[in-house]
Regions:
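Extracellular beta-sheet/turn segments enriched in Thr/Pro/Gly and aliphatic residues
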Residues: 56-57, 142-158
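Short, solvent-exposed, Trp/other aromatic-anchored flexible loops in extracytoplasmic proteins
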Residues: 100-129
Length: 158
């Protein structure tokens, strides 16, 4: 528990210091893609777990189960592993991104459960989708330092 609390504090500091996880979020015009994607803990979701597809991350931490939903269908959906590679000269973290799971579409009617890797100060779990302009968008799944809920934040890839 102490380790998780410390992780939440470091996460909050990281968000405060970096203004988000990546320059993509900080420098782009707000686009509805992020607001159409939703993530929450399985215990807080209003879904039938037996009806959901489950994706298990390598080195998954069994209690850490997130549900990803969307309000629209997104093509080229991926569950990705994120590893911090470096912090850019501008102070933004840059991640190595490894695809763990691919699905042609994340459908609004088909939530997906992700059994996540344990995460400390930076997100280690994420999702990627193709937006309406055909661009790949990568979002880290992070734990809020305020209330422990899950957050999506756009990240930069290596």
């Amino acid at each position: 528990m102490r380790k998780r609390f410390l992780g939440a504090i470091l996460l909050a500091l990281g968000i405060g210091l970096f203004g988000g996880w990546g320059s993509a979020q900080a420098n782009s015009v707000a686009e509805p893609t992020q607001s159409m994607l939703h993530v929450c803990w399985l215990k807080d979701a209003h879904v039938n777990p037996a009806a959901c597809e489950v994706v298990r991350m390598p080195d998954a931490f069994e209690p850490a189960k997130a549900v990803v939903t969307s309000s629209v269908d997104f093509p080229d959906f991926q569950v990705v592993a994120l590893d911090l590679r470096e912090v850019s000269a501008d102070g933004y973290p840059v991640f190595n991104v490894q695809s763990i799971y691919y699905k042609d579409f994340l459908r609004a009617t088909e939530p997906i459960i992700i059994v996540m890797r344990d995460s400390e100060s930076f997100p280690r779990n994420g999702i990627a989708v193709r937006d309406s302009l055909g661009r790949e968008r990568i979002f880290g799944i992070a734990i809020s330092g305020e209330d422990g809920s899950l957050l999506l934040s756009e990240v930069d890839r290596n």
